[in-house]
Amino acid sequence: MDLEKEVRALYLNNRRIKNGFQFTVPSPGTYPYQWLWDSCFHAIVLSHFDPESAKKELLSLLSRQLPDGMVPHVIFWKQGLIRPYEWGWGKDDIGSITQPPMLAYAAWEIHRRAPDGAFLEKIYPQLLAYY
């Protein structure tokens, strides 16, 4: 068994590209959306063998950041499935809550494995707004 090969295959199978953004779904059948915590952990794992995809994972999360800095806990990239947060929230493509902050840690872990000051400079204002 080649664990690294299997992990790479799993991540490739669970990779999605929507509206120009790349992300990883935790489980295509059960959880077909992008989740904040999951994506942060996916990015950390990806940083070991595909740092560019790790960066794209975080950039896709930050693409749906609200003006007040909140990053939603779920992004419904694929419409028409389950949208339990639509009522009372007024947005049909994101969740109405967030999750504990993992974004900066994920960004730092990516940077530790594949130093990229330009990437950190690009996302720093959004991270600051989130925290």
Residues of each region from the PLM?
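Low-complexity, Ser/Thr/Pro/Gly-enriched N-terminal "stalk/linker" regions
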Residues: 1-34, 52-56, 60, 69-71
